[in-house]
């Protein structure tokens, strides 16, 4: 039995041989190709030896016709170790389950703390956090990273300027900086309406005040459109002029559109892999063999694991893999011109008031160079040009 590792896997049994025919019994074992080792003869009627577990049945048959008896002392090797483990499995499983439960509890969210926010903002933030799973009782390794949580809150809450996210063990701490809305300045009760830019008047809707212009009049920036001083010289009254004065204004825009554009698009195919990281070693948990994509986008989210408040050298990592492919958008010259006009209109309207509209547009210049179409566009816009100007006493 020179191969100790093989013997450990098969299993060995230490036996005691008692009787007069010990030597004859041992010789019979050799003839039956039963491997015997570590034979120790105490006296003429007592000896000990080691046999393989698989030869126990053969030994039982041989001992029937022998002038001696055998006693099994102990067994060693993997089969006996397995048997002992199974015998004590209840305790082992209970012990293991205890630590697994402690580990899971140590990686759950038990507290969400928000500081620096008014009660109304805090309530709103708590609801937003619950939508993405950041609440008491959730597993931390199933949540988004602090950076993504921070981005989500700033994108979905208009009343905060900044929010800091910090994970301390089983607690999530949020430090909020709210927007300081400027207090509305107390406006003077008396005011004129003046033109905020050059225009040709197209319409007037005056609620209070004395109109000083009429339709088709050309006005310059700063010119009074509706006076807050009404009445005649004998019966003069000062009011807060109120209303809307629409005028035709003019804008110029430069827009360029490439005829060919290369970009990457997601195909919709993808998968998610999960790993348990131990320093430099990464063990896959599931999603082992997945399709390899020629071009892909990979997003990794790593969550450190804790045992109570202590950070373990273990971390859970989720890797989302999405397939992407190259795509090319090609415009004809006419299509590029139409796209440029569309972009120009959208860009202009985004800078104007809600009730502004484009009356007309004209391409002043058009050229194609280096795979791009460039347009110089003139716009005619109808918009409210009225702005307020306080009336100072003594005017």
Curated annotation (Swiss-Prot):
Query: Gene Ontology cellular component?
Result: membrane
Q: Which domain of life is it from?
A: Bacteria
Where in or outside the cell it occurs: the entry states: Membrane
The alphabetized UniProt keywords are: Membrane, Sporulation, Transmembrane, Transmembrane helix
Q: How does it sit in the membrane?
A: Single-pass membrane protein
Q: Which GO terms describe its biological process?
A: sporulation resulting in formation of a cellular spore
> Its principal location?
membrane
List all membrane-crossing ranges: 90-110
Q: Which family does it belong to?
A: To B.subtilis YqfD.
Q: What does this protein do?
A: May have a role in completing stage IV of sporulation.
Name of the protein described by the UniProt record: Putative stage IV sporulation protein
